């Protein structure tokens, strides 16, 4: 009898926990980013990261190799290197704790201009030690592409590795190593190393980077200190660069649990040498950033600012030219959460864009000649002001997100972006779709995407991604194809093996207007141990 009673209590606790998880929102809007929690969704177990990313309203798919648009892919805030397609198409949603879609993190992450970050926080597979996976790409004009992805975990250590190789009129090799050490409940160390080697007939280049991130939690309230140190070296036939960097950041409640503060300092020292002329220049960036969030039961108010101090020095012929300047990234945002299903956001963001250092130090024209005219010997900024209105409705099987942003760009064309996405899950079928609309005086363009997935008997999974571009869409003008398509077939074999095939850029094979024939088959294999 006592044993049956304990079983009943355990079942009730599990039921309450499940109901609590189902009541939590799948999507959470924050001041500078949107959080997606795959574990709160109803998953079959075989959904990929790419399937979840279809929920992102501003996702712009330009092709199988241009899925993330302007997003920089990171894992635990460490930039990924090389071929990221395997990560997108093969990483399981059940292995992801949360996805941070950072579209306005100029204060928190120091992104410049329209730069965005897609940060993946992984979790170890349940009852498994890890997984290993690989892929190979076979096409008419794209040949010799392969990647390997692996995750291994123990009680105190997780190790993630990604390596990719590409042979197409040259060789490209990429390696990423990512290790997390949990010393105890309050101390954690994350180390990161990446290397790339590119050997093309025109030039050979290489880059290595190492970074360490140490986290210490002081108390039960969540006061946390982050310390970061890193170094990067890059070299090509024209330039060589050395870049040491540091970050110190404190996140803590302030005075009460309702008010939280993020305070940080960040700096790097870029040393560049032009090999042919032996000219050199140094750029020292030093940032101070502060952000406050005040939370009420249904309201969240966030204000923040990052001040960036630039000091740059050009050395040539014994003469030293020095310049200094200051930049500001600012945000102010209010989020209204009437219940656990609906969220509404109104935000203002001030960003800036700098001309390339090459324009100033090498007297060289970039893709935009106006950059040199704008610089006139100084790195003068262009201000970008964004006003954003967003709404999200989310639960386990249905999520709808809409975003509207107006951008006022200094000395450039102002424009408006309207984005919407929807996700719906029913028995044996998942439907995801969205649209992106760009409006400016010079013209209007749009894209429409639809991504259904069917779950068949014997664990077969068939998915399709279709994106249509209007005539003035930059993607259509670049590739000539009005439609992008990718057909995916996946089949698990037992509990450990999964085999998949992606036929990507498939309409390039049939469209006479295609400027590049990119269609190919990508074969993927995963083993979980």
Task: Please describe what each predicted stretch is.
Residues 135-140, 154, 165-169, 193-199, ...:
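Transmembrane beta-strands of outer-membrane beta-barrel pores
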Residues 24-27, 50-81:
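Extracytoplasmic beta-strand/coil segments of soluble accessory domains associated
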Residues 168-245, 270-272, 281, 353, ...:
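Flexible loop and strand-edge segments within Gram-negative outer membrane beta-barrel domains
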Residues 78-104:
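Short acidic/polar hinge/loop motifs at secondary-structure boundaries
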Residues 49-52, 86, 111-134, 146:
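N-terminal periplasmic accessory domains that precede
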Residues 121-134, 173-175, 182-186, 262-269, 309-313, 322, 336, 340-386, ...:
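Surface-exposed extracellular loop regions of Gram-negative outer-membrane beta-barrel proteins
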Residues 333, 390, 517-529:
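Outer-membrane beta-barrel "beta-signal"
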């Amino acid at each position: 009898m006592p044993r049956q009673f304990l079983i009943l209590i355990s079942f009730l606790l599990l039921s309450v926990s499940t109901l609590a998880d189902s009541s939590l929102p799948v999507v959470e809007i924050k001041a500078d980013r949107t959080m997606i929690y795959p574990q709160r969704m109803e998953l079959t177990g075989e959904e990929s990261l790419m399937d979840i990313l279809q929920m992102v309203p501003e996702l712009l798919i330009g092709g199988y190799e241009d899925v993330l648009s302007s997003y920089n892919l990171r894992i635990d805030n460490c930039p990924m290197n090389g071929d990221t397609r395997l990560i997108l198409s093969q990483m399981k949603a059940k292995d992801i704790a949360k996805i941070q879609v950072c579209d306005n993190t100029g204060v928190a992450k120091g992104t410049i201009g329209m730069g965005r970050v897609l940060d993946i926080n992984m979790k170890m597979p349940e009852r498994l030690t890890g997984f290993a996976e690989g892929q190979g790409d076979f096409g008419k004009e794209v040949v010799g592409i392969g990647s390997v992805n692996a995750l291994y975990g123990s009680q105190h250590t997780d190790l993630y590795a990604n390596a990719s190789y590409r042979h197409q009129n040259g060789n490209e090799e990429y390696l990423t190593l990512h290790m997390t050490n949990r010393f105890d409940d309050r101390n954690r160390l994350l180390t990161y190393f990446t290397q790339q080697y590119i050997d093309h007939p025109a030039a050979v280049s290489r880059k290595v980077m190492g970074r360490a991130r140490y986290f210490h939690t002081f108390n039960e309230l969540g006061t946390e200190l982050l310390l970061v140190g890193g170094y990067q070296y890059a070299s090509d036939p024209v330039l060589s660069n050395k870049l040491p960097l540091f970050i110190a950041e404190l996140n803590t409640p302030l005075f009460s649990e309702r008010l939280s503060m993020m305070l940080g300092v960040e700096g790097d020292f870029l040393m560049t040498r032009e090999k042919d002329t032996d000219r050199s220049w140094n750029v020292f960036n030093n940032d101070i950033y502060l952000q406050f969030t005040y939370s009420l039961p249904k309201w969240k108010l966030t204000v923040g600012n990052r001040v960036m101090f630039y000091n740059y020095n050009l050395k040539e012929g014994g003469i030293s030219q020095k310049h200094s300047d200051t930049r500001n990234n600012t945000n102010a945002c209010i989020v209204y959460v009437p219940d656990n299903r609906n969220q509404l956001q109104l935000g203002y963001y001030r960003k800036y864009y700098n001309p390339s250092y090459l324009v100033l130090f090498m007297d060289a024209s970039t893709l935009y000649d106006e950059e040199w005219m704008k610089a006139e010997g100084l790195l003068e900024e262009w201000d970008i002001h964004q006003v954003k209105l967003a709404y999200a409705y989310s639960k386990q099987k249905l999520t709808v997100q809409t975003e509207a942003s107006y951008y006022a760009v200094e000395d450039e064309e102002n424009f408006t972006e309207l984005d919407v996405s929807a996700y719906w899950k029913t028995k044996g079928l998942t439907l995801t779709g969205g649209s992106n609309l760009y409006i400016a005086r010079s013209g209007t363009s749009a894209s429409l995407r639809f991504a259904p997935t069917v779950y068949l008997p014997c664990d077969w999974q068939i998915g399709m991604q279709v994106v249509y571009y209007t005539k003035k869409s930059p993607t259509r003008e670049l590739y000539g194809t009005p439609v992008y398509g990718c057909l995916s077939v996946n089949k698990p074999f037992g509990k450990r093996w999964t085999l998949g095939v992606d036929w990507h850029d498939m309409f390039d094979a049939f469209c006479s207007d295609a400027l590049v024939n990119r269609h190919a088959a990508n074969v993927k294999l995963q083993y979980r141990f």
